Amino acid sequence: MSEKIKLIGIGDDGFEGLSKKVQSIILDAEIIIGGLRHLSMLPEVVAKKISWSKDLKQDIKKINEYKSKKICILASGDPLFYGIGRLLLEHYSISEVEVIPSPSSLSLCCARIGYNIKDIEVVSLHGREFDDIIKYIQPNNRIFVLSHDKSTPSRIIELLNTLRFEDSNLYIFENIGGENETITKKRVNEPVNEKFSDLNSILIECISNKDSIYYPNFTGIADKEFENDGQITKSEIRAITISQLEPMEKSILWDIGGGSGSISIEWSKIHKNTTISIVEKNKKRIQFI
């Protein structure tokens, strides 16, 4: 490419929230690519505007068609924080892309309430399985949730009540960084009457009690905690087995003849970013897993 692709992070304060230098890059562009919401934030521009389709990977490949042009891609906040940046850099090297970030939603939210980013775990539910969050719900944990849509806060409140984490605190951030920014702080056990914006993020302060339900993050969980028909690796053997397997971040486990799934279930609790494939032919045992 003759010029680098400019990958520009834009906040909820839109074009006006960008520096003059970044504004001039956008105004000078010949091709501007982004979501409809981001494109609508721009003033009149001479560039051809292209909105993402449902097939992002194909759209990114097509960028090559404009390689002789000055290209800007608009993304939310920090494009490398659960954004389009990762996917773009799978197809183009960093020598072909200049990343110009704005503050991430996490940075803005932590700044509003004075929390240290390093003390917080991040979970994205955007286009992912909602149940992915369950493994993060632990006593004294702080979790930042990138919501899927306006229903996410209510679903999280329902889940926390079900898991008996009803004393936990929530911060619900809507339209963070924009004119319509709002921050709602509430206890999980308080009534929910709010209608939330699609653009929301949530910070959970997990507060447990003696009745709280959560996945232990240690090995040797009691056998009675697993549904089984007697085909189960006993607690003490399970603890030794898993320690010998030495699970690490991004490890892959194949469990052949899963039985109750106890080995795999415990393995998954040690690190959150692991992959497990279980092979089990007994239909009844599949239901246990």
Predicted regions and their residues:
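Conserved class I S-adenosyl-L-methionine
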Residues: K250-G259
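Phosphate-coordination loops involved in phosphoryl transfer and adenosine-cofactor binding
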Residues: S2, S68, N140, K250, ...
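Short alpha-helix immediately C-terminal to the canonical SAM-binding loop
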Residues: R285-Q287
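Short, glycine-/small-residue-rich phosphate/pyrophosphate-handling segment
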Residues: S105, C110-N141, H148
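A contiguous loop/helix-start segment that scaffolds small-molecule binding in enzyme catalytic cores
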Residues: S2-L7, K20-Q23, K69-I71, R142-G230
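Class I S-adenosyl-L-methionine
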Residues: M1-I100, S107, F130, I276, ...
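Conserved alpha-helix/loop element of class I SAM-dependent methyltransferases that forms part
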Residues: I232-E249
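Conserved SAM-binding loop of SAM-dependent methyltransferases across substrates and taxa
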Residues: S260-K272
